[in-house]
Design a protein with these regions (language model features):
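Class I SAM-dependent methyltransferase Rossmann-like catalytic core
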Residues: 14-31
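Conserved alpha-helix/loop element of class I SAM-dependent methyltransferases that forms part
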Residues: 28-45
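Class I SAM-dependent methyltransferase SAM/SAH-binding core
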Residues: 48-52, 56-102
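A short acidic, Gly/Pro-enriched loop at the edge of an enzyme's catalytic core
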Residues: 101-113
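A short SAM/SAH-binding and catalytic strip from SAM-dependent methyltransferases
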Residues: 112-124
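A short glycine-rich, Lys/Arg-flanked "PGG" loop and its adjoining helix->strand segment in the class I
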Residues: 126-138
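Conserved beta-strand signature within the Rossmann-like core of class I S-adenosyl-L-methionine
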Residues: 140-147
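Core SAM-dependent methyltransferase catalytic element
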Residues: 180-192
Length: 192
């Protein structure tokens, strides 16, 4: 049980050798989910993008390749993750250690917010979504994607689409659509 608890903690905030190894494993496991999810974005241009829970930044690189004209900031609470991500050098791509509950971004400054395989780890789901709503532009999009079974383990109270829809409405968001592919689910969310 101690090992399981340690692995759960590493998935929330990777650190040290184990955290670095897990991030490499996640790249293999979750980058295909990222590629699938971004196909559901409606626009071909998002000037300012925030990628939440970036790990070592590999998904953020794919975002930059998909939207080369965008300014993209990747955030994570893990010092280890951000140290690895900062090794990536691309124009208009930045990585910062920040908490999703208090990003420090200006009101309505982001066109697209993405979070892949991470929102079920946020310490305060309501505060996190309220912060994302604050920084998202009125015509912006929030795209979440994750393994569906993680929701039943970490967020059983909002696992059903209807419960998640109600939760989003309570924090000023609207669920536009959800899509499933095998074990994955994505949510397209806008301000209401």
């Amino acid at each position: 049980m101690l090992l399981f608890s340690r692995l759960i903690q590493q998935s929330k905030n990777p650190s040290g050798f184990l955290g670095k190894r897990m991030m490499k494993l996640w790249n293999r496991a979750y980058l295909p989910m990222f590629v699938w999810a971004i196909r559901y974005l409606d626009r071909t241009s998002y000037p300012a993008i925030l990628d939440v829970g970036v790990g070592n930044g590999r998904s953020t690189i794919l975002l930059k390749k998909t939207f080369p004209q965008s300014t993209i900031t990747g955030i994570d609470i893990s010092d280890t993750a951000i140290a690895q991500a900062k090794q990536i050098e691309m124009t208009n791509l930045n990585f910062e250690r920040r908490d999703v509950r208090e990003t420090g971004f200006s009101d309505e400054s982001v066109d697209l917010i993405t979070a892949f395989q991470t929102h079920f780890h946020w310490q305060d789901l309501e505060a996190s979504f309220m912060e994302l709503r604050r920084i998202l532009k009125s015509d912006g999009m929030l795209l979440l994607a994750c393994e569906y079974n993680k929701l039943s383990y970490f967020l059983p109270e909002v696992q059903s689409e209807e419960a998640f829809r109600r939760f989003l409405l309570s924090v000023g968001f609207e669920l536009i659509t959800s899509q499933r592919k095998g074990a994955w689910i994505l949510y397209k969310i806008v301000k209401n």
